[in-house]
Swiss-Prot record:
Membrane topology: Multi-pass membrane protein
GO biological process, one term: intracellular monoatomic cation homeostasis
Effect caused by changing residue 225 to Q: Impairs protein-trafficking to the vacuole
Glycan attachment positions: 420, 515, 550, 563
Name the record gives this protein: Endosomal/prevacuolar sodium/hydrogen exchanger
Coiled coil: none
Cellular component, GO, one term: endoplasmic reticulum
GO molecular function: potassium:proton antiporter activity; sodium:proton antiporter activity
Motif Amiloride-binding: positions: 124-133
Membrane side Lumenal: residue ranges: 22-61, 107-117, 174-189, 239-258, 309-313, 398-431
Primary location recorded for the protein, binned into one broad class: membrane
Length: 633
């Protein structure tokens, strides 16, 4: 190698000497070899010179090595935190810090190529990192709690996101209109930033909720809101960007609302139809005999919903979210047992890696993006505006939900009891405060900010980036303390996860087939791992008794019927039990609105989309209860 370099230099010297001999007026100087670092080499920091393929491959390898090292550090930190039972700090916060430290080192180092390679790329984010998170969220969605709290979720997600975007947009527009920092943006751009900063991403908080086993109702409301909120924020942002450079008129509001509703509805329909298509393919073919091919096809077809929707100028996130929900509701029960387990863990694995990569990217972006323009006052105003907007979106809407709940319950109970009843709030104040605290922003906002147009693009991008990092660190880092301060109910779900193979979903159904029992259970697509645990002994006893009175939750509470007359003996805890029973009764009344869809689903849709006897049930019916116990270990 050294001899080649020396020969190359000697050849160039001879060539230059001969050239000067022919043309002595030529003042060209000897140029360094491309293989050797010179003043124009990217190693020395000149960004205008292209690398040769070998050097480019070397720098790309170093960039990937750094990213993988950060990812390994984040996952190892997660293991350490889990082992030491440190639940106040989450790995996502550490991922941001790791990214910030390495980003600062890269920024201070000579050269630019590694810095350019690890810079946040919106195309990578939307096409590679975000889809696994959305798909897993829809697939792992607790459908029972989601549909039971659908009203609260929809109110927070749709009107709440709209209120948040409008409040943030108006505050930023007024601030920039004052001209204190020489920034002048249009109202459409201000609304675009408002939509960007309205995209919540409570990954950190929900992970802490899982560790503390927070009340599933609160978890579902925050989780469901964040799912729909991201999709709605993206649709709102794209709608606002269509009015960039145009004067804001009153008719623009109705035009924007129409575009939003059309985009959301068509995207939802695309996702549901593709999910149903997968269910029908699994039902009418024998692909389940080849689990590896089956798992690959399910994953790829699900991804197709995302890219097809984006290609049609719709929302890929909405399509992928509802495709995941439909896959779990219908296609799951047509899969082979191996594919059920494989798909579950593939989705979880990809989502976990993507989440950590995203937070590492956020930390790196603070220092590796050289074009960012930081305006401290604008950042402070933006941070205050998201708090004001979150307050306007949470507390008034919570009171509205409580009012609807109260009116409906009083009307429903008026025929049962003639006396006035005190209806508990559907969303108590401490739950409202926790929902407010869970409104931290995430990488979706940063990725959307990369699409902002105009002269002040990098100023607004820097503002969004700093606000996102601050909310993750401040709100995410103080969540554990807020759970104690607000006295949020924890420990609602057993620590033991006995559903790794998901045999707990189908084992009771197999017992019914073996014993010829006609007991109807809720262990179907509307149930999940958070459903009441039913043991074999309870199953045998409940055949001669009222089943709801014999099912106990992991927390020790019992579900009683409306005509419950047992246990009339004095009990110190009787009053608290009565309150819980009353709340269960009221909840049953309030959630009865979704019963029509469940009946329609059971009687019409499932016979069309599902096998009469799913393959999983066929496999489990040939085994004894002891076999299920042995396979779970």
């Amino acid at each position: 190698m050294l001899s080649k370099v020396l020969l190359n230099i000697a050849f160039k010297v001879l060539l230059t000497t001969a050239k000067r001999a022919v043309d002595p007026d030529d003042d060209d100087e000897l140029l360094p070899s491309p293989d050797l670092p010179g003043s124009d080499d990217p190693i020395a920091g000149d960004p205008d010179v292209d690398l040769n393929p070998v050097t480019e491959e070397m720098f790309s390898s170093w960039a990937l090595f750094i990213m993988l090292l950060l990812l390994i550090s984040a996952l190892w930190s997660s293991y350490y935190l889990t082992q030491k039972r440190i639940r106040a700090v989450h790995e996502t916060v550490l991922s941001i810090f790791y990214g910030m430290v390495i980003g600062l080192i890269i920024r201070m180092s000579p050269g630019h190529y590694i810095q350019d390679t690890v810079t946040f790329n919106s195309s990578y984010f939307f096409n590679v990192l975000l889809p696994p998170i959305i798909l897993n969220s829809g697939y792992e969605l607790n459908q029972v709690n989601f549909f039971n709290n659908m009203l609260s979720i929809l109110i927070f997600a749709i009107p709440g996101t709209f209120i948040s975007a409008v409040v943030i947009g108006i505050i930023l527009y007024i601030w920039t209109f004052l001209g204190l920092e020489s920034i002048d943006i249009s109202f459409a751009d201000a609304m675009s930033v408002g939509a960007t900063l309205s995209a919540t991403d409570p990954v950190t908080i929900l992970s802490i909720f899982n560790a503390y086993k927070v009340d599933p109702k609160l978890y579902t409301i925050i989780f469901g809101e964040s799912l729909l909120n991201d999709a709605i924020s993206i649709v709102m942002f794209e709608t606002c960007q269509k009015f960039h450079g145009q004067p804001a008129t009153f008719s623009s509001v109705f035009e924007g609302a129409g575009l939003f509703l059309m985009t959301f509805s068509v995207s939802l329909l695309i996702g549901v139809l593709i999910g149903i298509l997968v269910a029908l393919l699994l039902k009418h073919t024998h692909i389940r005999r080849y689990p590896q091919i089956e798992s690959c096809l399910i994953l790829l077809i699900a991804y197709e919903s995302y890219f097809f929707s984006n290609g049609c100028h719709m929302s890929g996130i909405v399509s992928l979210l509802f495709c995941g929900i439909t896959l779990k509701h219908y296609a799951y029960y047509n899969m082979s047992r191996r594919s059920q387990i494989t798909i579950k863990y593939i989705f979880q694995l990809l989502a976990r890696l993507s989440e950590n990569f995203i937070f590492i990217y956020l930390g790196l972006e603070l220092f590796t993006e050289v074009e960012l323009v930081y305006k401290p006052l604008l950042i402070i105003v933006a941070a205050i505006s998201i708090c004001v907007a979150r307050w306007c979106a949470v507390f008034p809407l919570s009171q509205f939900v409580n009012w609807i709940y109260r009116v409906k319950t009083i009307r429903s109970m008026s025929g049962i009891t003639g006396e006035n009843i005190s209806v508990p709030d559907e969303i108590p104040y401490n739950y409202q405060m926790m929902t407010f605290w869970a409104g931290l922003r995430g990488a979706v906002g940063v990725a959307l900010a990369l699409g902002i147009q105009g002269e002040y693009k990098f100023t607004l991008l820097a503002t969004v980036l700093v606000v996102v990092v601050l909310t993750v660190i401040i709100f995410g880092g103080t969540t554990a303390g807020m759970l104690e301060v607000l006295n949020i109910k924890t420990g609602c779900i057993s620590e033991e996860d006995t559903s790794d193979d998901e045999f707990d979903i189908e084992a009771p159904r197999a017992i019914n087939l073996l014993n010829g029992s006609s007991i109807q259970t809720d262990l179907g697509p509307y149930s999940d791992n958070n459903s009441p645990d039913i043991s074999i002994d309870q199953f045998a006893v409940s055949s001669n008794k009222n089943l709801p009175n014999n099912i106990s939750t992991t927390g020790g509470n019992t579900f009683g019927g409306l005509n419950e007359t047992e246990n009339t003996s004095p009990n110190p805890a009787r009053s608290s039990m009565d309150k819980r029973n009353l709340r269960d009764k009221l909840g049953t009344i309030f959630n009865s609105d979704s019963q029509w869809f469940q009946n329609f689903d059971e009687q019409v849709l499932k016979p069309v989309f599902l096998d009469n006897v799913s393959p999983s049930l066929q496999d489990s019916a040939t085994q004894s209860p002891a076999d299920f116990s042995s396979q779970n270990h």
